[in-house]
Amino acid sequence: MTNNNSNSNNNQTISNLSAGLKSVNLADQQQNEVNLNLLQQQLQNEATTQQSQSRISQFFQNQPTEGYTLFSHRSAPNGFKVAIILSELNLPFNTIFLDFNNGEQRAPEFVTINPNARVPALIDHFNENTSIWESGAIILYLVSKYLKDNGECALWSDNLIEQSQISSWLFFQTSGHAPMIGQALHFRYFHSCPVPSAVERYTDEVRRVYGVIEMALAERREALIMDLDVENAAAYSAGTTPLSQSRYFDYPVWLVGDRATVADLSFVPWNNVVDRIGINLKVEFPEVYKWTKYMMRRPAVIRALRGD
């Protein structure tokens, strides 16, 4: 997000400078100096771009023969989402963080593996350098391949019905959760001019999305407590004893089944930045907060978010 802001500020500065120069009659010598400076800046930018693109070119000319290569960005939650799954599956991978300021995402070699020129993208060097783009597609590829190679995958399922439930939440995250937070961040921090109605609209939609998740997790918790806290189940059902008094009230619950899957873990990086749009998960969505807290403690998640 920071890089986008930097681009916006730079563009605005250049635009203001251009407008200012039009209103001033410069002497020939001064004009020549300005032209020279602009030319030097242009040449420097071109050299930097060639250097950055050559970094990508060099990689594609000498690709590894094993492991995975993840193309990401330091400010891209979707890239870290894929890194979490790679880490959870204990798969060997290397991350290349693209420099958007220098246009590395538009390098011809990168566009051949992701025509959308965005991150994340993944290359599987074990499988003839197969490339996959879009975070949801990458995740499904990884867990499906892991299941095929190992016979089981804790983050996925070999049951078609459970697979469809996991996929539903994964697609909900990629199509509803992430884009709404992304738009709320954009209009709050990076848009060229304030648009309060857009900020309100997207923030409200993020809250609606979290309401869906909160309800699902609350239902899972109630079922867990009623199943495990048998001696108090009648009191909970009658409403004479609140569920919050159960010793199982803080046990982890998951969207599908009794374990964390990609349905859960795909939400982590975006949950980690939602406070920047003024949403307090702990106060507004306590089940989502507890769920996120449990996932953030997982060693693989910690490694992935650190960029290890």
Swiss-Prot record:
One of its GO terms (molecular function) is glutathione peroxidase activity. The keyword Ribonucleoprotein does not apply. InterPro entries: Glutathione-S-Trfase_C-like, Glutathione-S-Trfase_C_sf, Glutathione_S-Trfase, Glutathione_S-Trfase_N, GST_C, Thioredoxin-like_sf, Ure2. Pfam families: GST_C, GST_N. Transmembrane segments: none annotated. It comes from the Eukaryota. The keyword Nuclease does not apply. Residues 159-308 form the GST C-terminal domain. CDD domains: GST_N_Ure2p_like. Keywords: Nitrate assimilation. One of its GO terms (cellular component) is cytoplasm. Residues 66-150 form the GST N-terminal domain. One of its GO terms (biological process) is protein urmylation. Belongs to the GST superfamily. Plays an important role in the cellular response to the nitrogen source. URE2 gene plays a major part in the repression of GLN1 and GDH2 genes by glutamine, and is required for the inactivation of glutamine synthetase. URE2 gene product may catalytically inactivate GLN3 in response to an increase in the intracellular concentration of glutamine. Homodimer. This is Protein URE2. The gene is URE2.
